[in-house]
């Protein structure tokens, strides 16, 4: 009976402990709130969804005269979409499909459902459905290991890591880093099931290489004083993609956000440990973003070398390059866009980084052109295009170059979020489209024959996307000079026909003006 009770706790108590899950005060001090509501730190729109999954906080709020969220208590039916009790009409948005991709399905309704499961909160729901116990505790304070399919996500209690004999080299994701007995817990291990989950073994696709040596220990790591260090705070382990490339690094952040949903915890009173088996550091041009997820500096795994370290609560986060994951090389059904998941991610990060919407002012459409100081994919007639834009009085035009040494990432986000039409050549800088306002349009000036990358990202975020169509009106400097592949369209610079450019920009402007969320809804005849 005890074994069944413990198993039930594992499968149903999905949240990590943290600030937003801290128990309310039993006897409130007169004049003081019964709960630290400031620790929730979520956008106002997200509060009813949070309260839906944290009914204990909703109950306290109802009794507490100091609760700032009382107006949301009438909306507790609102849900993200992955909850089993969630009714479709109360979901946090639902994709829009405009045509049927016959390669996937034959109705618009099924297309919506496919897209929702591929790239929206249905994706988080599928990960929750996959969870199964791999190491079962016998007593309430034993260790445990719970994972999704292919070990893409795992959660562990009382995890033991022995780093006393670790050998590091240049390999960031060494597969045999831990030997038997060096990682594990005091629980009953289902070895056969664990070892059957290795089909997607790959550094940034699965935690199989790291957990295949998980061992059923004959001691209780913490209670038997087998740890040199005990980490009390909930800890997220992450294997990170390239920190110098916004497209790749934000695959890390998006998957961390999805992981928070799977855990039902958005607390920042957590540690994040970068799982890196090398002795190298990590170059991170977007480190300000971590402030949306943790109150502390990111910890390198090597910090714990030569020690036995025990983690009371540990999560192995969803990874940035998972097969059928989000959002690197994700095969998406065509004809659908607008995921609540990516809109919520954008709102979450902007809110926690204190990036606010400051306009538009006087109804003018704010156009931002992203210039490039790199060797390739420059706009050769950029000044000519800008001068043409400035002839339209309703456009407010600025040129930016997001050089990290000259413009900090938070300042970059402020510019992006206060842009209505974002224009740039194919490149990682277009990942900024994640933080455009809902009514905005992104204009990938030329996609360099990589057609899906930023089109799909715009579809996920739900902002309008356009790109250059007429090949006879774009003029490459030459055929391109890839260092090993020879001719390549990404390795040259381009000029553009001014009239065609203006036609496309005005199309984007028309979309902005017609968008239901555009703050100035009256049409501008000047355009």
From Swiss-Prot:
Role this protein plays: Catalyzes the transfer of a single N-acetylglucosamine from UDP-GlcNAc to a serine or threonine residue in extracellular proteins resulting in their modification with a beta-linked N-acetylglucosamine (O-GlcNAc). Specifically glycosylates the Thr residue located between the fifth and sixth conserved cysteines of folded EGF-like domains.
InterPro entries linked to this entry: Glyco_transf_61_cat (IPR049625), Glycosyltransferase_61 (IPR007657)
Q: Name the top EC class.
A: transferase
* EC code: 2.4.1.255
| Entry similarity comment | Belongs to the glycosyltransferase 61 family.
Sorted keywords for this record are: Endoplasmic reticulum, Glycoprotein, Glycosyltransferase, Signal, Transferase
Source domain of life is: Eukaryota
Query: How is this protein named in the record?
Result: EGF domain-specific O-linked N-acetylglucosamine transferase
Glycosylation is annotated at: 354
Single GO MF annotation:
protein O-acetylglucosaminyltransferase activity
């Amino acid at each position: 009976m005890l074994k069944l009770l413990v198993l039930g706790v594992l499968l149903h108590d999905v949240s990590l402990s943290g600030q937003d899950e801290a128990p309310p005060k039993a006897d409130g001090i007169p004049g003081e709130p019964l709960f630290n509501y400031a620790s929730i730190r979520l956008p106002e729109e997200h509060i009813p969804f949070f309260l839906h999954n944290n009914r204990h906080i909703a109950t306290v709020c109802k009794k507490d005269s100091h609760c700032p969220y009382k107006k949301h208590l009438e909306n507790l039916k609102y849900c993200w979409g992955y909850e089993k009790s969630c009714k479709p009409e109360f979901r946090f948005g639902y994709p829009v499909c405009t045509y049927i991709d016959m390669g996937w399905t034959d109705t618009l309704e099924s297309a919506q459902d496919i897209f929702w499961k591929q790239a929206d909160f249905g994706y988080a729901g599928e990960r929750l459905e996959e969870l199964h116990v791999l190491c079962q505790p016998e007593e309430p304070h034993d260790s445990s290991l719970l994972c999704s399919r292919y070990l893409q996500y795992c959660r562990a209690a009382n995890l033991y890591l022995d780093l006393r004999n670790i050998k590091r080299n240049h390999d960031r994701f060494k597969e045999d880093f831990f030997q038997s007995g060096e990682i594990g817990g005091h629980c009953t291990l289902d070895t056969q099931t664990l070892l059957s989950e290795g089909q997607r073994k790959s550094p940034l696709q699965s935690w199989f290489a790291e957990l295949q040596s998980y061992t059923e220990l004959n001691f209780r790591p913490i209670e038997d004083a087998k740890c040199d260090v005990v980490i009390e705070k909930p800890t997220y382990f992450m294997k990170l993609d390239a920190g110098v490339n916004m497209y790749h690094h934000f695959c890390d952040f998006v998957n961390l956000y999805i992981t928070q949903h799977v855990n039902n915890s958005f607390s920042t009173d957590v540690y994040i440990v970068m799982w890196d088996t090398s002795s190298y550091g990590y170059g991170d041009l977007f480190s300000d973003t971590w402030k949306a997820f943790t109150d502390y500096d990111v910890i390198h795994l090597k910090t714990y070398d030569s020690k036995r370290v025990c983690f009371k609560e540990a999560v192995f986060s969803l990874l940035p390059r998972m097969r059928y994951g989000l959002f690197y090389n994700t095969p998406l059904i065509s004809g659908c866009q607008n995921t609540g998941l990516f809109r919520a991610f954008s709102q979450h990060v902007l809110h926690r980084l204190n990036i606010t919407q400051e306009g538009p002012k006087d109804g003018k459409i704010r156009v931002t052109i992203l210039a490039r100081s790199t060797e390739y994919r420059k706009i050769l007639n950029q000044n000519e295009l800008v001068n043409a834009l400035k002839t339209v009085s309703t456009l407010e035009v600025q040129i930016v170059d997001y050089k990290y040494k000259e413009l900090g990432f938070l300042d970059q986000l402020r510019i992006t979020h206060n842009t209505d039409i974002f224009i740039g050549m194919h490149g990682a800088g277009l990942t900024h489209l994640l933080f455009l306002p809902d009514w905005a349009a992104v204009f990938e000036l030329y996609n360099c024959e990589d057609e899906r990358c930023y089109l799909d990202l715009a579809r996920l975020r739900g902002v309008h996307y356009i790109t250059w169509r007429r090949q006879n009106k774009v003029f490459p400097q030459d055929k391109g000079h890839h260092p090993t592949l020879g001719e390549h369209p990404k390795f040259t610079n381009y000029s553009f026909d001014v009239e065609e450019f203006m036609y496309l920009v005005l199309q984007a402007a028309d979309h902005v003006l017609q968008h239901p969320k555009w703050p100035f809804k009256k049409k501008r005849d000047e355009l």
